[in-house]
Regions:
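Short cysteine/histidine-rich metal-coordination sites, predominantly Zn2+-binding motifs
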Residues: 188-189, 209-214
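ATP-dependent adenylation/nucleotidyltransferase module used to activate substrates
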Residues: 1-175
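Flexible, glycine-/basic-rich loop-and-beta segments that form/coincide
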Residues: 170, 203, 210-212
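Short, intrinsically disordered, charge-biased short linear motifs at domain edges
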Residues: 172-174, 179-188
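A polyampholytic, Gly/Pro-enriched intrinsically disordered region
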Residues: 85-87, 177, 203-208
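Short clusters of hydrophobic/aromatic residues that line enzyme substrate/ligand-binding pockets
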Residues: 74-75, 79-82, 185, 196, ...
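Local cysteine-cluster metal-coordination motifs and their immediate loop/turn environment
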Residues: 104, 183-204
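Short amphipathic alpha-helical interaction/hinge segments
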Residues: 149, 207-210
Length: 214
């Protein structure tokens, strides 16, 4: 029996990353999840990520990092998370170079355990406008891998990059992702606020998919 290809999954516990985890398992990858505790106000996503990994019996690592310079309303609790904003420009919830940081950890992990692929649930259709969610960013990072690692042939896969939020939700349902266990809200409350970018994009997706969000 051929050996399964090892894959590193960047898992936040949100809708997109959870769908990516289930997608990778469905494709037959030997999945290893990376979960980040980086001082985000919405720490509930961490417990959601752990639940998703445990449900699929996927080994996971929680990486705790500090970004003391903050630079984002997700990190600075004195700053307000924007609500009901027009989806134009880069919002204050953008964390400087976050995906670059996360992918660097994933790349190191991949090299160390011999993983051939890294999967991230980035999306460039229904998104908040973050520059590190664009296809061009991942194309550039692929060059970083080639030039800066011994392994060189590790691939970064973005299976959701061109899907609408409604399409992601339909894929999640097809893959039997427990959507009720995912967490998308940027606020740190016990219930989703319904008005931050992430909540609104999620609601838009369920509405477009003609489904109710449980």
């Amino acid at each position: 029996m051929p050996k399964k290809v090892k894959a590193i999954i960047l898992l936040s516990g949100g809708l997109d990353s959870s769908t990516t985890l289930y997608y990778a398992k469905n494709k037959g990858y030997d999945c290893h999840a990376l979960i980040f505790d980086y001082g985000q106000r919405h720490k509930r996503e961490i417990s959601s990520a752990v639940v998703q990994a445990k449900r699929l019996k996927v080994p996971y690592e929680i990486i705790k990092i500090k970004l003391p310079w903050k630079g984002s309303s997700l990190l600075d609790k004195k700053a307000k998370v924007p609500t009901n904003r027009k989806m134009k420009g880069i919002p204050s919830t953008y964390v400087p170079a976050r995906n670059t940081i996360f992918l660097s950890f994933a790349l190191s992990y991949a090299e160390a355990i011999g993983a051939k692929v890294i999967l991230i649930g980035a999306n460039a259709v229904d998104f908040s406008g973050y520059p590190d969610c664009r296809p061009s960013f991942y194309e550039a990072f692929q060059k970083v891998i080639k030039e800066g690692t011994k392994a060189q042939k590790i691939k970064v896969l973005t299976p959701l990059i061109d899907l609408s939020k409604a399409e992601i939700i339909k894929l999640a349902i097809k893959l039997k992702v427990p959507l009720e266990l995912t967490w998308s809200c940027y606020q740190g409350g016990k219930k989703p606020c319904g008005v931050c970018d992430s909540c609104r994009l999620r609601d838009k997706g369920f509405t477009s998919a003609f489904l109710g969000d449980s």
